[in-house]
């Protein structure tokens, strides 16, 4: 089972709101997920992002792969550099 950290689209038409979830890669985008680890609202100015860092680090250590969009959100929040430093001992 390949696990991904990706965005699940919520909200109404033309007003997207995304939940950042951990899901099996075989499940559909808005299908069943394992755990919710944050959310992203692109409609606010500036964009509103809430991440549960401890849960995200836990899943990254277990081998979950973030999608490209989630990886960029994690990088902007500084989580990917902290994870990389912790993993490779800087």
From Swiss-Prot:
Biological process according to GO: translation
Alphabetized GO MF terms: structural constituent of ribosome
Xref: SUPFAM superfamilies: Ribosomal protein S16
Source species, domain of life: Bacteria
Record keywords, A-Z: Ribonucleoprotein, Ribosomal protein
GO CC annotation: cytoplasm; small ribosomal subunit
InterPro entries: Ribosomal_bS16 (IPR000307), Ribosomal_bS16_dom_sf (IPR023803)
Keyword Ribosomal protein applies: yes
A Pfam family per the record: Ribosomal_S16
PANTHER family given in the database record: 30S RIBOSOMAL PROTEIN S16 (PTHR12919), SMALL RIBOSOMAL SUBUNIT PROTEIN BS16M (PTHR12919:SF20)
Family per record: Belongs to the bacterial ribosomal protein bS16 family.
Protein name: Small ribosomal subunit protein bS16
Native organism: Lactobacillus johnsonii (strain CNCM I-12250 / La1 / NCC 533)
